[in-house]
Amino acid sequence: MGIRGLAKLIEEVAPAAVSKRLIQHYCNKVIAIDASVMLYQFITTITSGDGTALANSSGEVTSHLVGLLAKVIRLAEAGIKPIFVFDGKPPEDKQGELEKRRQAREAAELEQQKAEEEGNLERAKQLSRRTVKVTQQHCKQAERLLDTLGIPYVVAAGEAEAQCVAMAKERVCEGVASSDLDVLAFGSPCLIRNLAQGGDREIVEINLNTVLKELGFSYDEFLDLCILCGCDYANSLEGIGPKTAYKLIVKHRSIEEVLAADQGKLAEKALNWPYVRARELFKNPAVIDPKEIKKTLKWKPVNRGEAMQFLVEEMEFDRETTEKKLDKLVAARKKPKQCTIDSFFSPRSSNPEVTKTKVKQ
């Protein structure tokens, strides 16, 4: 779910924090990429004519590998050094959200079957995307492909987003690429959306310190805004959308004060609402020490033999097409990169600061 409505809210009340970038802006930079979200996007968007994911003759899904190979090539062509980060074990507090997602997938599967029986193929195609789940097998296959391509990856202790952010705070990387606004709630100094997506989609960068400055919020106040909007660890309260949440935090500065000022109405709705635990999970998530990750971080040459064995012999990719793609990747890595001037500047301060600027009304 991410943070409900946060992207649109930031565009409206803190537009200076949002920048449109060319991919060349990230030349020579190390970027942590939320791999779990990325694989889901590949499986739901790289599809056959009927809307189902690409698969080999054994029925094994291959869309995630097609997408991952293409993304690695595009990043290499732009001179970007990626670190892919996969989800580890989700916190127990997220089980409710995961159960809701499971139920939603099952409901979508039933609707899809009904649409197919009624001959409504377009509706069935739309519903097929809602039935997708990224499995451990998908992740292991992606990790194996990255191994053959010489690209480093990390399996997080918990949430991939939290691990990415911990790495950004310790300057192991210079930004976090994800579509999920949770990254800002975890405190990432820089969120990059649509990185190397292909097509005409603009890369959007959101700078957290600028968000805080524009809003006149401390990080703690911003985090309370995120929780009040609704997140994976705590659903939003009935009747409170992103704009209302923003106005309440502007006025009261914390969730406790919001509840206390409402003469018991919200407090009643908030009974058993785990906002305190949500704060703890965002501020102190389970992560691997970024300093330990940095010690072993290495980009290696492509192992063409292993890549061909996996993609062509095992996953049934077309041999000629795969050879050409690997040639393209090797050439991209060797070619000197033309970087934009601003790509050489250091990233801004990695820790959100308490700001004292005037609050926007």
From Swiss-Prot:
The keyword Transport does not apply. DNA binds at E159, G230, D232. Coiled coil: none annotated. SMART domains: 53EXOc, HhH2, XPGI, XPGN. Residues 337-345 are annotated as: Interaction with PCNA. Mg(2+) 1 binds at D34, D87, E159, E161. Its cofactor is Mg(2+). Mg(2+) 2 binds at D180, D182, D232. It is an enzyme of class 3 (hydrolase). Keywords: DNA damage, DNA repair, DNA replication, Endonuclease, Exonuclease, Hydrolase, Magnesium, Metal-binding, Mitochondrion, Nuclease, Nucleus, Phosphoprotein. Binds 2 magnesium ions per subunit. They probably participate in the reaction catalyzed by the enzyme. May bind an additional third magnesium ion after substrate binding. It comes from the Eukaryota. This is Flap endonuclease 1. It comes from Giardia intestinalis (strain ATCC 50803 / WB clone C6) (Giardia lamblia).
